[in-house]
């Protein structure tokens, strides 16, 4: 008989406050909730919830990803959260609003989008 691998159980941490990092690109939205030291507590993305293709970039997909990450963080006892938003995507506001409706208290919202001081040449303009 094969030896069973002993799987490590998830430890419930008691974390009162943390930081919600929302990375919103043109193709997807990733929400990662960390403690104040930067250790990951919960994460979710539009793609991991089953949204495929162009549906990943919608505000609704960002809302669902944000709610899923918030539920995971609240299982560890999180109550208050600071929000750091990065990127130009369409799911920025929807993700923040979803965090507020799940019951997490949002204390501050910061935009941490990296802005070049005339660095690399940007991609060509889109013609839609």
Swiss-Prot record:
GO terms for biological process: translation. The keyword Iron does not apply. One of its GO terms (cellular component) is ribosome. SUPFAM superfamilies: Translational machinery components. Keywords: Ribonucleoprotein, Ribosomal protein, RNA-binding, rRNA-binding. Located on the platform of the 30S subunit, it bridges several disparate RNA helices of the 16S rRNA. Forms part of the Shine-Dalgarno cleft in the 70S ribosome. This is Small ribosomal subunit protein uS11. The gene is rpsK.
């Amino acid at each position: 008989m094969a030896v069973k691998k002993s799987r490590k159980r998830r430890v419930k941490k008691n974390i009162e406050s943390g930081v919600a990092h929302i990375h919103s690109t043109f193709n997807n939205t990733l929400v990662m909730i960390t403690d104040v030291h930067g250790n990951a507590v919960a994460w979710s993305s539009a793609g991991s919830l089953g949204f495929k293709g162009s549906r990943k970039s919608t505000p609704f997909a960002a809302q669902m990803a944000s709610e899923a990450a918030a539920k995971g963080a609240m299982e560890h006892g999180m109550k208050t959260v600071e929000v750091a938003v990065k990127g130009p995507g369409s799911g920025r506001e929807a993700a923040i609003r979803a965090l507020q409706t799940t019951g997490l208290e949002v204390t501050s919202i910061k935009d941490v989008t990296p802005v070049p001081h005339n660095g690399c040449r940007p991609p060509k303009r889109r013609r839609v």
